[in-house]
Structure formats: structure tokens, C-alpha cells
């Protein structure tokens, strides 16, 4: 009897494993990786708002002594990075790789050095950002900004230590519903997409009903810095839907 019980238990485990593998195989590898490494909830202690369905942004914090000086120092470092890596080929040689470029003129492409991006989860070196932002122009790729990152569960205090919340805008990509590998491209990308980073599906219930892969948080917190643009810290002028109480607005 004990042997039969053990055999039944073993078969049950095997079936469960096989089912998990089969389900995983329904989705592209990159979505499976996002699911594995992504966050399990989009809740955060950081005072934040939703912009559209898939982006969560920090609220402007109360100015603190030294914020302006810190921000200026970051801009100086970012400007030096852009000058050094003005030639995108040099960035590539130093380990920066383009993240899903479309080839569309005017697009902004993140060139990410994954070793440096991992290091940013522990400490920040403003002269070695995890990502450099290039804009595609008729003259080639133009270095226009840098991106610094923090863990997806970072607190407001941690974000503020890296770039002052009274000046910088931090964001996370949230509420992602991955589609099956057989999904037509227009279902995952473009204005009519249901799945993916810009899809109309943005709740767990709707994602499950559509047999999608629900990923509450994709990647961690990130902030873009454009040292030579009028809006160097980009984002404060974006239209957002609040997901936090009004009492948090001045925190």
C-alpha cells in the first residue's frame, strides 16, 4: 500500500511538472523570463500615479536642502557620459546592447550594459549608467540621455538617495499581460494590441480570462536623464491617473 501511495505521489508530481512545462511552452521565452524575474505585485510604498495602463510614476517629493546641487552633479556626470559615448559603436564595444530597436526614424533606443545594470541594484555610479539612450536620426544614432535604475521594491528613500524625488521622475512598467507564442504581431504591438506593453488588457482577471501570462511588474524602478534637453528629468509634465490618495501628493 505504501508503495502504491508513493507511486501515485510521484506520478502526481510528474504530471504537475509536465503541465507547468507545457503551460510555459505556450509563451515566448522572453515573457517567461519577465515572469520569473518580475515582481509579484505592483503595490509600492513609493507615492505614485498611473500613466495610462502600464506605467507607474513617482510623485514629486518635497524639496530638501541640497537637492538642486545633487541634481546638477548628476547632470554633469550624464553629460560626460554622452560626450564619451557619442559614437554608438564605442558604447557597443563597451558592452552596451540595443534593447528591441524597431528601426523607426526618431525612436529612442535603450542601449543596456547588463553587468552595469545589475550593479545598479546595489550601488550607483553616475559615470557608468546601466543604459544609454540613443535617438535614431538621419545622421545616425545620437546619444541623448542616460537611465539609472533601482530595485523594483525600492522605497522612496532609496530612490531619493539616487536622484532627488523633488526633481527626478522615476517610473516602473506594470500590469503586463503576455500573449501566447502563436499570437499575431498586431495583437501584441501597435494601437490595436490586446496583450503586451501597450495592450488594452491591464488587469489580472482580464489577463487570466484571455489565457495570458500576468506579470504585475516588469523590471525595476528607472529614471531618465536628458542633460541637454529643456526638460532634463523628463516626465513631470505627463498626464497621469492617480492611484494614490491626495494626502500623498505633498509627501
Task: Describe the role of every protein-language-model region.
Residues 21-25:
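Boundary of Sec targeting at the N-terminus
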Residues 8-18:
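Bacterial N-terminal signal peptides
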Residues 1-4:
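Positively charged n-region of N-terminal signal peptides that target proteins for export
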Residues 27-132, 137-251:
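Primary mode marks residue(s) on the alpha4-beta5-alpha5 output face of response regulator receiver
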Amino acid at each position: 500500500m505504501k508503495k502504491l501511495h508513493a507511486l501515485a505521489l510521484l506520478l502526481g508530481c510528474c504530471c504537475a511538472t509536465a503541465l507547468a512545462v507545457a503551460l510555459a511552452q505556450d509563451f515566448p521565452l522572453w515573457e517567461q523570463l519577465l515572469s520569473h524575474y518580475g515582481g509579484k505585485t505592483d503595490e509600492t510604498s513609493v507615492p505614485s500615479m498611473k500613466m495610462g495602463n502600464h506605467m507607474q510614476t513617482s510623485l514629486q517629493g518635497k524639496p530638501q536642502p541640497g537637492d538642486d546641487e545633487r541634481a546638477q552633479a548628476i547632470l554633469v556626470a550624464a553629460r560626460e557620459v554622452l560626450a564619451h559615448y557619442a559614437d554608438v559603436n564605442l558604447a557597443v564595444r563597451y558592452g552596451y546592447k540595443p534593447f528591441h530597436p524597431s528601426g523607426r526614424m526618431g525612436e529612442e533606443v535603450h542601449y543596456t550594459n547588463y553587468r552595469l545594470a545589475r550593479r545598479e541594484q546595489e550601488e550607483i555610479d553616475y559615470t557608468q549608467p546601466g543604459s544609454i539612450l540613443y535617438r535614431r536620426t538621419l545622421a545616425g544614432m545620437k546619444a541623448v540621455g542616460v537611465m539609472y535604475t533601482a530595485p523594483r521594491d525600492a522605497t522612496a528613500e532609496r530612490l531619493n538617495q539616487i536622484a532627488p524625488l523633488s526633481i527626478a521622475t522615476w517610473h516602473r512598467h506594470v500590469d503586463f499581460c503576455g500573449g501566447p507564442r502563436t499570437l499575431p504581431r498586431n495583437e501584441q504591438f501597435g494601437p490595436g494590441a490586446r496583450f503586451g506593453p501597450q495592450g488594452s488588457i491591464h488587469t489580472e482577471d482580464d489577463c487570466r480570462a484571455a489565457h495570458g501570462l500576468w506579470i504585475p511588474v516588469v523590471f525595476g524602478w528607472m529614471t531618465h536623464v536628458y542633460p541637454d534637453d529643456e526638460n532634463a528629468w523628463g516626465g513631470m509634465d505627463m498626464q497621469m491617473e492617480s492611484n494614490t490618495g491626495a494626502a500623498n501628493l505633498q509627501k
